[in-house]
Curated annotation (Swiss-Prot):
Organism: Rubrobacter xylanophilus (strain DSM 9941 / JCM 11954 / NBRC 16129 / PRD-1)
Signal peptide region: none
Function summary: Catalyzes the interconversion of beta-pyran and beta-furan forms of D-ribose.
Catalytic reaction annotation: beta-D-ribopyranose = beta-D-ribofuranose
GO BP of this protein: D-ribose catabolic process
Active-site feature positions: H20
Entry keyword set: Carbohydrate metabolism, Cytoplasm, Isomerase
Pathway involvement of the protein, from the record: Carbohydrate metabolism; D-ribose degradation; D-ribose 5-phosphate from beta-D-ribopyranose: step 1/2
Annotated gene: rbsD2
Name the record gives this protein: D-ribose pyranase 2
Length: 154
């Protein structure tokens, strides 16, 4: 038995399969998941599990290079928007029209994780990154400028 981390086997397997720039969508209970999408359905009841819990657990194991959200979220769900800004500080945010989140973003996802969240505009794209510090730790490798900020160097 695993001691810690995500215990759900399908979710753990999907996260382990991600490479650089792959897109994971973590969505609310009402998200129209495309028929052919690889999905993990965690929803049990309204807000069980909730979006913030699932995102927090994923964030402990997943390197997020970019967060994709609906541009309407800041206006119509400021608590969720603020929470995301806090928990994904230092990560690039891309804002897309809500309609694109339901269509283009959904069909671009390598996998979709459905929560029980009843959270307006609660559909979040996480673009997989790389561990910059580890990739460029070997002697003789040169850290490109565009990765310098991700590694926390000035």
């Amino acid at each position: 038995m695993k001691r810690s981390g995500i215990l759900n086997q399908p979710l753990s397997n999907i996260l382990a399969s991600f490479g650089h720039t792959d897109l994971l969508v973590v969505c609310d209970a009402g998200f129209p998941i495309p028929r052919d999408a690889q999905r993990v359905d965690l929803a049990i009841a309204p807000d069980l599990p909730d979006l913030r819990t699932v995102l927090s657990l994923i964030n402990e194991e997943f390197i997020t290079e970019k967060v994709v959200i609906a541009e309407e979220m800041a206006e119509f769900n400021p608590p969720l928007h603020g929470w995301l800004q806090k928990h994904f500080s230092g990560v690039e945010f891309e804002r897309r029209p809500h309609e694109e989140m339901l269509t283009q973003v959904a069909t671009s996802a390598k996998a979709i994780v459905r929560t029980g969240a009843f959270d307006p505009w609660g559909n979040i794209g996480l673009v997989s990154g790389v561990d910059v510090e580890r990739f460029f730790a070997k002697e003789g490798t040169v850290l490109p400028d565009y990765y310098r900020d991700r590694a926390g160097e000035a």
